[in-house]
């Protein structure tokens, strides 16, 4: 009787182990990672980037009650200003289009540049600035955002841009 009971128990345990699903590539495509989480200095808002496998990231801003306030595709490197009035972030181009351009060996100066997004937390207004190279905000002072942009792409007339590229 003891041997029969042991054999039945062994069969049940081995069948339970065999039912576990093995991870494959499709599971990694839907796997979410939270990156660069930050909180305002007054503690009323949190911001994080949600990365889904090899796809574009999403920037999400939530209030202290975990209600979604703002969500933007292709956004990353988000920061809050010191006075907790604005969220500043970079908007990237679609990863698929960038990979396609790299595959076609497009020159680096013809690749699309990033956009700076500034979201007003008080009145929910979004302002965008194109052709951004980088940006910085002060850690303990508010009211300023310093950014650099590509002057040639932003202000040059179209006929001058064509002459420079030739």
Residue ranges and their predicted role:
Residues 1-23:
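Bacterial Sec-dependent N-terminal signal peptides
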Residues 18-166:
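Beta-propeller folds
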């Amino acid at each position: 009787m003891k041997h029969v009971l042991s054999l039945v128990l062994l069969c049940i345990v081995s069948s339970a182990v065999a039912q576990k699903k093995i991870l494959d590539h499709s599971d990694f495509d839907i796997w979410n990672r939270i990156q660069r989480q930050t909180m305002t200095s007054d503690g009323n808002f949190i911001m994080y980037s949600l990365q889904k496998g090899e796809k574009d990231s999403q920037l999400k801003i939530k209030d202290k009650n975990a209600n979604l306030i703002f969500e933007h595709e292709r956004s990353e490197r988000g920061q809050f200003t010191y006075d907790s009035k604005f969220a500043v972030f970079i908007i990237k181009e679609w990863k698929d289009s960038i990979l396609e351009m790299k595959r076609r060996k497009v020159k680096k100066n013809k690749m699309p540049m990033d956009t700076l997004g500034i979201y007003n937390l008080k009145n929910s207004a979004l302002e965008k600035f194109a052709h951004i190279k980088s940006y910085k905000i002060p850690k303990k002072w508010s009211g300023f955002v310093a950014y650099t942009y590509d002057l040639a792409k932003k202000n040059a007339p179209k006929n001058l841009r064509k002459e420079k590229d030739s």
